[in-house]
Amino acid sequence: MTASTEHRLEGLEPDNLLAFLSLLGLLRALEAAGWRPRAYWEGLPLRPVLRLREAKTQEQVALTAAEGCTVLARNYQFAASGEFKLSIDQLKSHLEAAINCSPAEGRSADACLSAFVVEGSLAKDLKPGKHAFARSPLDCLGGGQSDLLSTLRDGLSLLGQSQSTANALAKALFAVWKREDDRKSLRWDQSDYRRHAYSAKAPTKDHARQEWGANLLAIFGSSLLLGCATAGGRSKLSFLVLGSRLVDGSGVEVSWPIWLHPASTSGIQALLAHPGMSEDQPNRDILAALSVSAVYRARKIWPNQYAVFTRAEVV
């Protein structure tokens, strides 16, 4: 296949939270492998474009991203335990371990953890022996944090097979998703919402299949959505991540920009942190000065015991 400094990522639709996080994960993985990638959005239908400093083929992009994923996976040691019932002391132990690493490794490990748990956000009904911290906005699973960690482990499980990983990443990035993988889901893809009334099959045998490569990249991309504790007050949610906002007291929405000029992960983080991203009606003139042409927003809903993020809409 022809080498190029730009690759259109046909699999990553702009109105899908999983696809957006996958884009962030791709950039992080390539950075971890020593590249200096950028991305921007263009065309009809709208898709992100990966820009590289040197011409590479799609196969080289996927293989290098797989190598970067293996490097990034070292930051997810907190997911190795069978259950995710962290006490305050256990979380402090993880944070101290990150501090004792090199500055870059420590920041990466802390960022990966903060997307799912932060020290200042305690559970409302704190009980001995139970998980001490509030649910992350990105946690859509109904069985508590043990479900979350089990799903993270499942997403990381095939990383030892570099060629298989590269093939899965290429499918997720360069082709329309077929969702053929029978794996666990973090439920960041709106297709995970399945209605079972009048279904020909039992729900347990007719669950939504996944695009595993996209889920893998999204795990790493989520670390750019740094978590923090909120003031709480009357809200039931005391934990937000970058790009998210509270709605209706306890609901949560996640917003992300569409930018027209090549940006790195640091630049994208800065856009996510812009105050205009959380406004009901973002000021288009202000955002246009930052090359942002649109803002997409998805809402977390609970149709049953599991949450899911809706298809995003332009606001």
Residue ranges and their predicted role:
Residues 35, 41, 177, 188, ...:
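A residue-identity detector for tryptophan
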Residues 141, 177, 200, 205, ...:
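Generic structural signal for short, flexible, solvent-exposed coil/loop and linker residues
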Residues 148, 152, 186-188, 256:
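Generic structural hydrophobic/aromatic packing signal, biased to beta-strands
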Residues 1-174, 192-194, 218, 226, ...:
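Conserved small-residue
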Residues 130-134, 179-207, 223-224, 229-236:
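Short linear interaction motifs
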Residues 2, 9-14, 206-209, 213-216, ...:
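Elongated scaffolding segments in large macromolecular assemblies
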